[in-house]
C-alpha cells in the first residue's frame, strides 16, 4: 500500500477547474514504474485556490478516484466542490463530474504510451444568480456543458509529453451581462471587466503538456509547460441586439509555466509541491476559466 501527500496545481488558464488537463493520460506528475506488471489504484482528496485577474478567489475541493482494472486498463472519477469569492459576492456548490478510461497502448522497461477517452458531465446549468442578478462564469460551479475528452501521453522516468482535446457538445444556460448589475448600483468599472456570457458556446480546446523530472534519492524536482489552444472563438447572445455573435479574442493560445518539488519520506509517503503561473493569456475569457496562478494541497492514498 502507498500513500502520498501532495500539493498540486491546475493550470492558470485554459482548463476547467479539475478539468481535462488532469484526466487520465494527461495528468501532470504521473508515476512511472518499469515494473511491467503493476496495477495502480488510488483515492485523492485535494484542495486548491486560484486567483483571477479580477481578484476573485476560486476554491476547489476534489475527490479523484483511480482504479486499475487490469495491467493496461484504468478508470478515473473526479468530483469537485467549487466555491468563488470576489467583488460580486460568494457562491459555492458541487462542480462537474469527470469520467475517463485509460488504456496503456505500449509499455516497456524504458517508456509507455497511454490513451484516454472520457467526458465531463454537468451537475448544473451555469445559471446561478446573486440577489436575482445572473453571475458571470467565474462564479459558476458548473460549465453547464457535456464535453467529450480525448488524450494521449508518452511517459518515461524523466519525461512526460501529453496532448488532448476537449470538445463541448452543447450551449450552456448562463445569462450574465453587466446591465442588471449597473442598474442595481454596481460600479461599471468593476462589472464591465467581466465578459457577457449569455447562452455561451465555448470553443474547442487542444492541450499540450511537457514535463521534465529530476530525481535524486528521496527528492524530485519537475519543471514544465502547459499550453491550451482554443481552436475557435466562443459564441454568445448579444445582450442588446439578442443576436448570436462571436467573442473577439476568445480563441488562441494560453500558456502556463509549472514548477514542482516532491520529497519521498518512505515507500509509503511522499510530499509534493507544484506551482503554476500564467505566461501567455487569452485577452477575453467569457467561460470564466482564466487564472493568474493556482496552488493547492491534497492527499493521495494508493493501494
Give the positions of each predicted feature.
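Surface-exposed strand-loop-strand hairpins of Gram-negative outer-membrane beta-barrel proteins
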Residues: 35-62, 89, 137-141, 246-247
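Residues that define the transmembrane beta-barrel architecture of outer-membrane proteins
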Residues: 57-61, 91-97, 111, 142-148, ...
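Outer-membrane pore/translocation modules
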Residues: 91-197
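Transmembrane beta-barrel domains of outer membrane proteins
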Residues: 64-66, 102-104, 151-155, 162-164, ...
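Short loop/turn motifs that connect adjacent beta-strands in outer-membrane beta-barrel proteins
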Residues: 14, 27-35, 72, 106-113, ...
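Outer-membrane beta-barrel biogenesis signature
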Residues: 10-52
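Outer-membrane beta-barrel translocator domains and adjoining extracellular loop/strand segments
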Residues: 48-52, 56-58, 82, 87-92, ...
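Outer membrane beta-barrel transmembrane domains
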Residues: 39-46, 50-51, 75, 186-303
Amino acid at each position: 500500500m502507498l500513500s502520498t501527500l501532495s500539493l498540486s496545481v491546475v493550470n492558470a488558464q485554459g482548463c476547467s477547474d479539475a478539468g481535462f488537463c488532469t484526466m487520465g493520460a494527461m495528468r501532470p506528475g504521473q508515476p512511472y514504474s518499469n515494473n511491467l506488471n503493476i496495477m495502480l489504484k488510488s483515492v485523492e482528496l485535494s484542495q486548491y485556490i486560484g486567483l483571477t485577474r479580477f481578484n476573485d478567489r476560486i476554491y476547489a475541493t476534489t475527490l479523484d478516484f483511480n482504479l486499475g482494472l487490469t495491467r493496461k486498463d484504468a478508470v478515473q472519477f473526479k468530483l469537485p466542490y467549487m466555491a468563488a469569492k470576489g467583488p460580486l459576492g460568494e457562491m459555492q456548490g458541487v462542480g462537474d463530474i469527470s469520467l475517463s478510461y485509460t488504456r496503456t497502448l505500449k509499455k516497456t522497461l524504458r517508456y509507455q504510451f497511454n490513451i484516454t477517452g472520457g467526458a465531463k458531465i454537468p451537475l448544473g446549468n451555469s445559471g446561478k444568480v446573486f440577489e436575482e442578478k445572473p453571475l458571470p462564469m467565474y462564479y459558476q460551479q458548473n460549465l453547464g456543458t457535456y464535453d467529450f475528452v480525448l488524450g494521449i501521453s508518452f511517459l518515461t522516468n524523466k519525461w512526460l509529453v501529453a496532448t488532448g482535446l476537449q470538445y463541448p457538445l452543447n450551449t450552456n444556460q448562463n445569462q450574465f451581462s453587466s446591465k442588471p448589475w449597473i442598474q442595481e448600483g454596481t460600479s461599471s468599472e468593476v462589472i464591465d471587466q467581466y465578459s457577457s456570457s449569455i447562452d455561451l458556446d465555448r470553443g474547442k480546446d487542444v492541450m499540450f503538456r511537457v514535463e521534465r523530472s529530476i530525481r535524486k534519492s528521496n527528492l524530485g524536482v519537475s519543471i514544465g509547460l502547459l499550453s491550451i489552444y482554443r481552436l475557435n472563438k466562443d459564441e454568445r447572445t448579444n445582450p442588446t441586439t439578442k443576436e448570436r455573435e462571436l467573442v473577439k479574442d476568445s480563441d488562441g493560445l494560453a500558456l502556463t509555466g509549472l514548477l514542482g518539488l516532491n520529497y519521498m519520506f518512505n515507500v509509503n509517503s511522499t510530499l509534493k509541491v507544484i506551482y503554476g503561473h500564467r505566461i501567455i493569456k487569452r485577452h477575453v475569457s467569457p467561460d470564466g476559466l482564466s487564472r493568474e496562478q493556482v496552488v493547492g494541497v491534497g492527499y493521495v492514498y494508493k493501494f
